[in-house]
Amino acid sequence: MSNIIILAAIILYLGMVVWIGVICSKKNSDVGDFYLGGRKLGPVVTAMSAEASDMSSYLLMGVPGLAYLTGLADATWTAIGLALGTYLNWLIVAKKIRLYSHGYQAITLPDYFSKRFGDDKHVITLISAALIVIFFIPYTASGFAACGKLFNSLLGFDYHAAMIVSAVVIVLYCTMGGFLAASTSDLVQSIIMTFALAVVVIFGIVQAGGMGAVLDNAKALPGYLDMFHTHIAETNSSGDYGFFKIVSTLAWGLGYFGMPHILLRFMAIEDENKLKISRRIATVWVFISLIVATGIGVIGLTLSKNGIIDTLTGSESETIIVKISHYLSTFNPVAAFIAGIILAAVSYTHLTLPTNSLV
């Protein structure tokens, strides 16, 4: 029964995404509207759609799984690096690319680079477009593959059928609504992701026996709560987390400066003077969300130790939020529906990869 309710919640969620595409299609009157939403995004939509499309499945699966296996150091230093990268990207790049792209009437990044550097022969256009296509193909494919694996493991769906359904949903709302549909659905996704993180962390703490029980379990593991050591689950020992590891982890934040789907949000905001508001919203949301996601991993390990959910190893640890949500669904129909919404959010984080690649 719980699986049927979960499936209903996921179908409802995906139906809402297609509906957003239909609504947004009525607001597109030219190419500029389709590719940049007519440069009419407000500061909240700009901030939250950028970060939801950026975080994708890493926030709900990668970070909790990392914390579950190794403790605070790896996940927390990553969170700090990503928060700093987010802030600096908004501070350094956002306003300039908004002003220049608008001044040159450029609606895509290759078009912007070509006009910005006087590329009359369109060599820069071809190179930048080729780089985006080449590197976004595996990025997009990973999103489709993740959707297939998620629905297969969660509901027993055929792997290939799940990928096809995911592709149909993406193509429908992207071709109908374009950039505005992608940005609006990402805004909704950011709200649902926030809801999912809050529900899972509160439910997990209660089921673990309280925050005291969670901390007691974590303290018993060597290096688990140490920012300069990491826990090694295989040997139940700790390892050094030194300077070079910290620097390399912090360097994750440098990736933001070249992410096309984030740069397009900068180009699409209605007023460059509102980017300061977007920067604050984005940075705060990213940092808090990553810290909560780290907490879910720590809480999840306690649930495993208590026998409430299975002990996870290796890449299985990335399904910790799925396991907790599935356990939530066993309580009653309302809990099952809430779990379905959470799992729909998880599934949609995989869809944001191909969505932003297409748009």
Question: What does each of the following model-derived ranges do?
Answer:
Residues S2-S25, G37, A67-I107, D111, ...:
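Extracellular loop-to-transmembrane helix junctions
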Residues L14, S53, A83-T86, I132, ...:
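Residue-level recognition of pore/gate-forming positions within transmembrane alpha-helices
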